[in-house]
Amino acid sequence: MLWGKGDGKFDGSKVFKGGKQPLTVVNIDVNNDGYLDLVTSSNSLHALTTLINNKDKTFSSLRDFASGNFPKFVVAADFTGDGFEDIAVSNATDDQISVSLGKGDGTFTYPPIYHHVNEHPQGMAVGDFNGDGLIDIATSCRDKNMVNILTKKNMINPKPNPIPPDKI
């Protein structure tokens, strides 16, 4: 952690335990106290780790929680509009994005809501990509050289993936 001085420079550094082999970190207020907490993806644990802001330049690590196989990138937004921030994770070997809904007390719903995407989802971004006023998720898919966009319409109550007739 590098503490900002407000002039483009940073003061000191502090290390906090954040899972095992963490790949990404996202800032999110998981317990609704007005202070930014952190969530890391722990690739080797197949889990996420929440670090709660103690409001004194320290963080307490909560227990790890499942997210899918080989979580790569994490993004945060209020996907449901309930005032609590939620998280989405790209799970590279499952070819899925998992969405866990924030409860506002430092925990998330389990099991997550899984969404199939093209091969090996990696980087992610959130925003209103289709102009409907709702937050969507974009993810890059490494092996297909494409970007998938999961719209809010299908994010919380996903439609089943259709099976082509030749696969029945």
Where is each model-derived feature located?
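Beta-propeller blade termini
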Residues: 3, 23-30, 72-79, 101, ...
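Blade-edge motifs of beta-propeller repeat domains
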Residues: 3-20, 52-69, 101-119, 151-168
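Glycine-aliphatic tripeptides that mark coil-to-beta-strand junctions in extracellular
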Residues: 34-36, 83-85, 133-135
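Hydrophobic beta-strand segments that make up the repeating blades of beta-propeller
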Residues: 38-41, 87-90, 137-140
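Blade-level signature of beta-propeller repeat domains, shared across WD40, Kelch, NHL, RCC1
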Residues: 122-158
